[in-house]
A protein has these predicted regions:
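Phosphate/NTP-binding elements of NTP-utilizing enzymes
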Residues: 1-141
Length: 141
């Protein structure tokens, strides 16, 4: 896995147990791709079953952006499998390197407050958070 400085800064923040990490930068600056690489690493190194949510303003935005990048990362690392991808629910399962645990990476849109209310998770990545209203953001946390 080829990693960028954005990846390294986010990894450092995760290791330091930062509760909130904000990435700012221009288009195509590797923010989304680097964070998705980090999500794969978190799932692989997990010492328990983890739930990781990847959220964006609309599902088409998510599908053409973060989800496409996530599949590409999994394929490049020979981790993608149809058996581990629930295309109906937009969920990917990733086995930990020790083989004992399986993390769930779920993709969903935040275009309805009913979709974001209540679910518990270990990690949350809001892609293009500036396009999400504050109430929805608050519900996601």
């Amino acid at each position: 896995m080829k990693c960028t400085e954005v990846f390294n800064r986010n990894l450092k923040a995760i290791v330091q147990r930062k509760r909130l990490i904000i990435n700012q930068g221009g288009a195509r600056s590797s923010k989304t791709y680097s964070i998705l690489q980090l999500i794969v690493l978190i799932a692989q190194k997990a010492k328990g079953n983890r739930i990781i949510s990847v959220v964006s303003e609309t599902f088409p935005h998510l599908k053409k952006g973060a989800m496409r990048d996530f599949i590409q990362i999994l394929e490049e690392d020979n981790l993608y499998s149809d058996a581990m991808h629930n295309k109906t629910d937009n969920v990917f399962l990733i086995k930990s390197l020790c083989g004992k645990f399986t993390s769930k990476v779920e993709f969903f849109s935040a275009d309805s407050s009913s979709k974001v209310r209540g679910p518990q998770r270990d990690y949350l990545f809001i892609n293009e958070c500036n396009n999400i209203d504050y109430e929805t953001y608050y519900q996601l946390l």
